[in-house]
A protein has these predicted regions:
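Short gly/ser/thr-rich secondary-structure transition/capping motifs
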Residues: 59-67, 127-131, 191-194
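Hydrophobic beta-strand scaffold residues
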Residues: 63-64, 126, 147, 179
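Non-catalytic C-terminal accessory region of glycerolipid acyltransferases
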Residues: 4, 131-243
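Catalytic core of membrane glycerolipid acyltransferases/transacylases, capturing the structured
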Residues: 25-50, 58-59, 74-129
Length: 243
């Protein structure tokens, strides 16, 4: 079976599974309490994407090294997980490893037929709600959630990282939780800015996710933001030089 056919099968399988989950999610949300439903919703998304990447690797389409993130699964208390954002796959790769993960999503994705109902069931957070987004993010962290944020705000255009947007370090300060960095490295162009979902890249797509430095929350959240941006830029440059 050629790589393009395997790629098409993977996309079709993922679309089918997500569609089924999005049909089930509204029903489950009516049957389960808020607390239990949120837990089921987040674990369900992690299970779906972990299975998807397992299939992708078995088909020879991807090689993923993300095992280091498993150390965060059972860590108690709230935590912000901050990652650079080279491709559209990043959130799905991290979510697969974090069953307590909470994503901040564009409003249009929360209306998407393949993602919306499942994301609402998991109580993911809209990124266009202003102070409401801050309030929801802090509340989720205080409930023990692991909040995934991309400080660049969108996929990287200028390597190694684009300028970081304010907000992540303010949320950490308000919730009094640390920021755990995750460095994502890939030389594949697939789903980088402007790359369409259905356009097949050279295979296999090789992606590595590794845990980086952890930053404490601080009242001077702007200084922490600057330090965070410098850290990501330095680590990604050093990693490429060492490769």
């Amino acid at each position: 079976m050629g790589s393009r056919l395997r790629f098409a099968l993977l996309i079709a399988l993922l679309g089918f599974v997500l569609l089924v989950w999005n049909l089930l999610s509204p029903v489950l949300s009516l049957l389960l309490s808020r607390r239990v439903g949120t837990r089921v919703g987040r674990h369900g998304i992690a299970f779906i994407f972990r299975g998807c990447w397992w299939v992708a690797e078995r088909l020879g389409l991807m090689r993923i090294d993300a095992a280091s993130l498993d150390a965060l699964r059972d860590e108690p208390g709230g935590l912000i997980v901050a990652a650079n954002h080279p491709t559209m796959l990043d959130a799905l790769l991290v979510a697969a490893r974090l069953p307590r993960g909470v994503c901040v999503m564009k409003a249009e994705l929360l209306r998407n037929v393949f993602l919306g109902a499942g994301a609402r069931f998991a109580r993911y957070i809209r990124n266009d709600a202003g102070r409401g987004m801050l309030r929801d993010a802090v509340a989720s962290l205080k409930e023990g959630g692991q909040l995934l944020l991309f400080p660049e705000g969108t996929r990287t255009v200028r390597w190694p990282v684009d300028a970081f947007k304010p907000g992540i370090t303010l949320i950490a300060h308000l919730a009094r939780v640390p920021i755990q960095t995750v460095l994502i490295e890939s030389e594949s162009p697939y789903l980088t800015k402007g790359w369409p979902l259905l356009r097949a890249p050279p295979f296999p797509v090789v992606i590595r996710l590794r845990l980086g430095k952890r930053f404490a929350h601080d009242p001077d959240h702007r200084a922490v933001l600057r330090a965070l941006e410098r850290y990501f830029a330095s680590e990604l440059v050093d990693e490429r030089r060492a490769a």
